[in-house]
Curated annotation (Swiss-Prot):
Protein name: T-cell surface glycoprotein CD3 epsilon chain
Proline-rich sequence as annotated region, ranges: 164-171
Topological domain spans for side Extracellular: 22-111
Disordered as annotated region, ranges: 146-192
Post-translational modification: Phosphorylated on Tyr residues after T-cell receptor triggering by LCK in association with CD4/CD8.
């Protein structure tokens, strides 16, 4: 037998042994229902003598039914280990659950389809507004009369204009007196 086949047979045998060795006792999980500020726990097992609830190993008085309703649930104060067990004796059959939940008063539950619909509609509306503004600005640009900039507005005609001489230097930047040395006149003069 090849080593590859040997490993496959060995793996299959281990898988079968693991499946046969599994515990047949089925554990029923707690049912937790959150609505607004209230949390409802359902004990996974029915006890004949009645049920008692414990939170952090302290008995909760007045809660003897299969359902435990926690009104005004607070994440900080109400979180902890919850147990439901038989009223008399038989503490071995206790089921323990660690509960930490966030609740809010005005929350609304939405499913995946509703969220996807909201996102797609938002994208479509945004693209529609974008196209509307684009075509509106394009049509406005076509209706506008072209404006030519005059020479006094800082614009020069493009290309060479042989009839116009070069502009006169601006007298604002000329030295005030020819022989006077200004504060910054000595900067960057290496050849002097």
């Amino acid at each position: 037998m090849q080593t590859g086949n040997l490993w496959q047979v060995l793996g299959l045998c281990l898988l079968l042994v693991g499946a046969w060795a599994q515990d047949d006792t089925e554990q029923n999980p707690y049912e937790v229902s959150i609505s607004g500020n209230s949390v409802e726990l359902t004990c996974p097992k029915d006890f004949e003598n009645g049920i008692q609830w414990k939170r952090n190993n302290e008995q909760m008085k007045g809660h003897n039914e299969k359902y435990l309703l926690l009104d005004q649930f607070s994440e900080m104060e109400s979180s902890g280990y919850y147990q439901c067990l038989a009223t008399e004796g038989n503490t071995e059959a206790a089921h323990t659950l660690y509960l930490k939940a966030r609740v809010c008063k005005n929350c609304m539950e939405v499913n995946l389809l509703e969220v996807a619909t909201i996102i797609v509609v938002d994208i479509c509306v945004t693209l529609g507004l974008l196209l509307l503004v684009y075509y509106w600005s394009k049509s406005r640009k076509a209706k506008a009369t072209p404006m030519t900039r005059g020479a006094g507005a800082g614009g020069r005609p493009r290309g060479q204009n042989r009839e116009r001489p070069p502009p006169v230097p601006n007298p604002d930047y000329e030295p005030i007196r020819k022989g006077q040395r200004d504060l910054y006149s000595g900067l960057n003069q290496r050849g002097v």
